[in-house]
Every structure is written in C-alpha cells, then in structure tokens.
C-alpha cells in the first residue's frame, strides 16, 4: 500500500524534535523503513541521533542516496502561533507546525518515494537514506557522523539528493547544485582605558575596530564566478559593554559573517582578515585578535548527469525547468559533496523557521512523485 506523504509529514511534525532532541521522529521513520525491508542502523554519536537505512546490496554498483534531517529549530513564543507548533494540523490547504517546511515534508516525501519504489519495482542496485537529528545545531555529529560511519563500514552512495526546501515561490522552479561557504570572524580589540577628556592618554579600541570594520565592509571580495554570485561580508555585532559615556573602554568586540563563493577558501579569507587587522594595529597601536569559525567551504556539483536527472523529473511532474542555483545559506550537502555528487531539491521554503511555519498540502504529493520519478529514471 503506497505511503501517504501528507499523513507522514503530519506525524513527523507531531514529534517535538527540537535540536538535539529526537522526539520520536527517527523512531517513526525507522519503523516504516524496517517494515519495508530496509536494513536500518542507528548511528548515534555524542548523544546525537542519526539513522542510516539501505535497501539492496551493500556495495552495489549503483546506489542512490537521499539525505535530510528531522531536527527543527525552537518554536520561540508558542503563544504567537496561530496553531499548535507540534500539532501537525491541516487547515485551509496548509499543514501547520514547526518543521513542516524545513524539512519534515521533504523527508516524508523521499521516505514514501523510496518505500513505494523498492516495493513496486525493486531496482538492480541499492537505495540509501541518511537522516540526521543534528542539522539545525552544530552539525558536527549528524551527517558528518553518518558519512564517517559509512566510510568505516564500506557503505557508499553513488549520488545523493538532499531534500531541503529549495524553491522560492513555486514548486519546481529551483534546485541547488552548490552552496556558498560560511565563515564567522570574531574580533577583539584591546586598547588602554582612559578618560574621554584626555584621549591622548588612552588607546581607543572602539576607533581602531571601527576603522578595521570600515575597511572590511567597503572591500569588494569579488565580482562573482561562473556559478556563484559575489561573496558578501556582513557586520553582525559591535560591542563595548561600556555603560559610561566619559570613559574610553579598554576592550571592544565585533563579529562579521562572510558568505563566500569558489573564488575563496576559508583559509584564504582568514589570512586576509589577519592581514587587515595587523595593518590597523600598526596604524593605531591597538592589538586586534581574530578568531575564525568556518562552518563550511563553498562547493559545487557541476551541471551534468545528476542535475539533468533531477531537472527532467521536476519538469515532467511540474512543467517547470528548475534553475540550477547556488544561492542561500549552507546545508548538509556541503558534507556529502566530499563523498559523491549531490544536488538539492525540495519544496517552497518561505515560512521555514518562522512563527506559523507551514507547507502547502498540495505540494507534498507532487514532491513524492518527483522523487519517485528520479528513482525510476536513475535505475532505468
């Protein structure tokens, strides 16, 4: 009997799986997949829940993989929601709740497609599902842990589709063939405290750090590349923690976030930031220290067989030819790319992470149909 992806989405939304809680979501999926003949393994690392499931022979020449997550961000003020954020209620043509868009509907669609496919037309190959409970958090023990375990166990995917929401307005209009890298830089400027009436007796870290931030934010990192828009730098914090208006503080901090294309690496950008900080230190005498966190490098799956496979299936089911894009934030596809070609395609993501997150019910079954067609075409 075919799996209803709408009902499964609602059941998953009712699982309160706010990172790092599993909330019963992976347990539910594991029961469904095990009952359909998938070999399931829980790959939990450092208390983070993950699920690996494979139908077919280990080491098959052709193995199609799906990747997704069941963890969700916090609901915020629950009183601000029109409906129960974990109710999975269907009303007015929408399915409401935290994770409805990001990305329990996508997971439900590919679970349903995978089960129906292997039961109706068992392929000459394998189908693998990697589902994590740690995508919205630090993402260090989620998909990374699954891929580490797979490498150790001799498991592999030939290609992978990540079911994240990718479409801005209409189902079918966009797929992701890559993502920008992300770096957060934390600057700490240490000067000499003093009276504001005698600035020559102090070393003002505020002025020094402001000079550095101005230099960074006025610099064009690049003009974009073949498949990427221009890299961006945004100032996100600037703090002194100084309640006094007549005191030059000794300490000032600032944070910038850089979203970068394939013209850069995290290391090359960190080197540039260090050089700029050193220049300002030389000019002002204020020591400026940098601590950088690279959340992920940019990556690209060049247009080819996988993206064409996805595009044909999307067009056949929706009438739209999806634009291959690298826009937006980062995703777990950045980890998968080191193991096999990866493309992302999913629903419209306009309400993800918002109060009253919801997904249009009429999109969920077509998404399952797209995934099912992709599987059929891949193994044809």
Curated annotation (Swiss-Prot):
The active site is at 71, 135 (proton acceptor). GO terms for biological process: diaminopimelate biosynthetic process; L-arginine biosynthetic process; lysine biosynthetic process via diaminopimelate. It comes from Cereibacter sphaeroides (strain ATCC 17029 / ATH 2.4.9). Its cofactor is Zn(2+); Co(2+). NCBIfam families: dapE_proteo (TIGR01246), PRK13009.1 (NF009557). This is Succinyl-diaminopimelate desuccinylase. GO terms for molecular function: acetylornithine deacetylase activity; cobalt ion binding; succinyl-diaminopimelate desuccinylase activity; zinc ion binding. It is an enzyme of class 3 (hydrolase). InterPro entries: ArgE/DapE_CS, Bact_exopeptidase_dim_dom, DapE_proteobac, Peptidase_M20, Peptidase_M20_dimer, Peptidase_M20A. It catalyses: N-succinyl-(2S,6S)-2,6-diaminopimelate + H2O = (2S,6S)-2,6-diaminopimelate + succinate. Zn(2+) 2 binds at residues 102, 136, 353. Catalyzes the hydrolysis of N-succinyl-L,L-diaminopimelic acid (SDAP), forming succinate and LL-2,6-diaminopimelate (DAP), an intermediate involved in the bacterial biosynthesis of lysine and meso-diaminopimelic acid, an essential component of bacterial cell walls. It holds the Pfam family M20_dimer. Its EC number is 3.5.1.18.
